[in-house]
Swiss-Prot record:
One Gene Ontology term, aspect cellular component: cytosol
Binding-site residues for S-adenosyl-L-methionine, renumbered to this chain: G83, L88, A134, E135, R152
Family to which this protein belongs: Belongs to the methyltransferase superfamily. RNA methyltransferase RsmG family.
EC number: 2.1.1.-
Taxon lineage: Bacteria, Bacillati, Actinomycetota, Actinomycetes, Mycobacteriales
Name the UniProt record assigns to this protein: Ribosomal RNA small subunit methyltransferase G
Length: 223
């Protein structure tokens, strides 16, 4: 079993319970989740992709709460992870949902190189890495239209919709991880979302198995 750090102040549980939660979320690919945790805690931290204070919180704040967003996605669809960074949420999602075809979009060279290394080391055949920004024409042409565009902590909601919805087919949607400010962002950025082609909005939680479920906002592309 891959090594990992049991964090304090979030789970308040034993090693066995963390293993149980990880096994539930990642299923038969749980060993790949441990391997990814190890890469983030070592290379990811050394190369500046994960802050030292975040390393003890990798399971709760990064791997598990990202993986559970798959609960909001249909089977066998194409997903784009915008501003993937160290691979969040795209890599945990790809591990938990091998039926998904996931493209990680990341503008910085050093991060995109790391993502490529993770893909190879974990043998994630359902993952592709594109270096660039979601709003760039070349990226959009290379990607094509996807069913879902997802992201975490990338930008305010209105700007995020402007990046995400153009990548999505008509009838598809963007699914963003957001915190408690999501309602205020939605009210503030309503016009920007509409301009980007957004329609029906849904705010909901996934990951009931977690102590702190993940809050998502889903916006369907209608035009």
């Amino acid at each position: 079993m891959w090594g990992y750090t049991v964090e304090k102040g979030w789970f308040h549980v034993k090693h066995e319970e963390i293993e149980s939660i990880a096994s539930h979320v990642f299923g038969g690919n749980v060993d790949k989740a441990y391997a990814y945790h190890e890469l983030l805690a070592t290379d990811g931290s050394t190369r500046g992709f994960i802050g030292p204070r975040e390393v003890p919180k990798l399971w709760s704040r990064h791997l598990l709460n990202c993986a559970v967003i798959g609960e909001a996605m249909d089977e066998n669809i194409r997903v784009a992870d915008i501003g993937s960074g160290a691979g969040l949420p795209g890599i945990p999602l790809a591990i938990a949902r091998p039926d998904l075809t996931i493209t990680l979009i990341e503008p910085l060279l050093k991060r995109s190189v790391f993502l490529g290394e993770v893909k190879e080391k974990l043998e994630l055949d359902n993952v592709t890495v594109i270096r660039g920004r979601a709003e760039e024409k070349a990226v959009r042409e290379q990607l094509g239209l996807v069913d879902v565009a997802t992201s975490r902590a990338v930008a305010p909601l209105g700007k995020l919709a402007g990046w995400s919805l153009p990548l999505v087919r008509l009838g598809g949607k963007m699914i963003a991880m957001k915190g408690s400010s999501v309602h205020e962002e939605l009210e503030r950025d309503e016009k920007m979302i509409w301009k980007a082609g957004g329609g029906k909005v849904k705010i909901f939680s996934v990951g009931e198995v977690l102590e702190e479920p993940t809050t998502l906002i889903s916006i369907r592309k209608v035009r």
